[in-house]
From Swiss-Prot:
Lineage, uppermost ranks: Bacteria, Pseudomonadati, Pseudomonadota, Gammaproteobacteria, Alteromonadales
Gene3D superfamilies: Glycosidases, Golgi alpha-mannosidase II, Immunoglobulins
GO biological process: glycogen biosynthetic process
Source domain of life: Bacteria
Name of this chain's protein: 1,4-alpha-glucan branching enzyme GlgB
Family: Belongs to the glycosyl hydrolase 13 family. GlgB subfamily.
Amino acid sequence: MMTQANAYFYDGADVALLNGQYTDVFSLLGMHSANEGKALIVRCFLRNAISVDVISIKDGRKVASLDKVNEQGLFAGTLGRRVKPFLYLLRVEYPLCQLDIVDPYQFDSLLNSDDIYLFGEGSAERAYEFLGANWRQTQGVEGVHFCVWAPNAKRVSVVGDFNHWDDTRHVMRQHLANGLWELFLPNVVEGAHYKFDLVYQNGERHTKSDPMATQMECAPHNASIVPPKAHHSWNDTAWMSKRAATAWHKAPMSAYEVHLGSWRRKGEQGEQYLDYQDLIEQLIPYVKEQGFTHIELMPISEFPFDGSWGYQPVGLYAPTHRFGDANGLKAFVDACHQAGIGIILDWVSAHFPKDPHGLVRFDGTCLYEHEDPRKGTHPDWDTLIYNYDRGEVRSFLLSNACYWLREFHFDGLRLDAVSSMLYLDYSREPGQWLPNAYGGRENLEAISFLQILNQRLYQAFPGICMIAEESTAFAGVTKPTDQQGLGFGFKWNMGWMNDSLSYLGRDPLYRQFHHHQLTFSLMYAYTEQFMLSVSHDEVVHGKGSLLHKIPGDDWQKFATLRAYYGFMWGHPGKKLLFMGCEFGQRNEWNHNQSLDWHLLAYEPHQGVQRWLKDLNHLYQAMPALSVQDYEGAGFSWLDCENSRDSIFTFVRYGLAGDAPLVFVINMTPQLHTGFRIGLPLAGDYREYLNSDSQIYGGSNQGNAGTVVAESLPWQGMAQSALITVPPLGCLVIGPATGLAEAN
């Protein structure tokens, strides 16, 4: 028997609710005072329900049976003589089962006014704690609090496994003042799939993944996933304390860039990714043995297209499913720290893809992106550019950076494509871009965002490293923000990389005419805090591997590569090397398969790997190679003009009491005997490293491990020595005692 709708619903409210057009659902559904406070009424909308009883949660007693208003699932009824609100559940009889459902429409808003203010202002650092899907408890009831920013949507519902993806079942509470929609849902389980169903102002319906989801489905599926309640228990206190006390610009920093999906694979055909436990057991010991101080991970935020390598993320807060869950990732970072290895994360804040389930026109308007394509579309990648002028977008990005550093203990972020953020005309022709308020080409909003980001992160997370991939001559990338700089800790030295790799590809006979390509970088080495990077971008898209770039026979290729690494490790600046380069991978990188580890069955590849390992260990052991990386006093040319022989000689200095190191690099196959070099100290010297040693695959030309200085001034030094310079080789020479002071 049906009860007339007008007995419980305002005129037309029932019809609007059934049609999904009643947005202020909390004023209608749930428990409300009626009859001037002399009664309570409960209304609910449960499709396919046969009957509904109201049960007191406190004592489990049935309070009332609701009247069925119509066949579509509207129920309502008064609660006898009760006038004081109480917690209740709905006991719902369906054709095949009975369910107890804690009514979500009986709960007040769980949002905090301070959080809302900071989010709108653009300074929220923990927006992920109230946006997205978070486990909460209110009035003794546990559930998931769903919240999403969609100010221009007409209606937003949360849909998922728990409501059979019915968009009318869980319409969310709208906050008109700030554009947030929320709903606290009991009866939701860990691992439940969900999305947000949005009705745009034009009436269109679109289902979107949660922008703040911390877990997502495997592509091609794109549902968000309710996270687990259990959290990783950290054991890296010693590392975090050490990190906070370390001045990284004065410390050795040698990063191994890794694409987790192709470093190594498993399965009979190499078709399976390693999971985080595999990586703990295999990658960490390898990196430790090779002497790298850090791992830099290419992006691991969820991304649908493997070929993007992670640089087109859709789930910025969700660690990709490919290698395990969030707790697995935390365990991996924890294990890195316990092994004494830092871990940097590639972070994509310059753009986002147009996947329809993602951020694009999220609420029917250009919410996260600029509306004008001259500012909102990236022409190179056909992606969208964040609107850095919008407070909520800044909070979304700032909170995401904090999320990875706070919740996952990453030791820093490497920001991708910073140049594209800094300039409004980046990759655009005249007429395709809009000038800033002063008529210039600088993106003032993006610059301001980067300054705030770096300032906030360095303040909140002591000892982190913020690294910029920035390829232009933009001034002050690593200057502090109070000096009008961007505030990064380090900047990739793209100029050094391009020049040195170009030199590497020259025939040794003609390198004398391009000598400046290896010396020019010292003209600007102290204008920024540079990191020398040979990244994935240099060994892909037809560029070939490093070994492939080098002319000559195999012996010359391997010898040149070893000498090049010697020059790189001796040059001022921190280091980054892409995986596979450390053993001389022959093929260019392929993200769809493992590195060619079988090459290590061959001695030349073993030699390059051993050389890199020894360089790294020397780099960590000798302060001269890092403590004055960004001070002119830390480097001195002995001879930068010997283009005829293509030989480069220089000294690296540490602080008082640190042994200086002399580098001699020969970039031709010519052996030089009786070659005189200046030395900073008198006495005996030790040949610390010789890339031409037989153990590295060389011809064993050198100085038998020792060099003796004589009192003959040379190259501006009070003493010198005659040495043998091996072909295509690198020598690293230092005082045998290691303690005397240089002139």
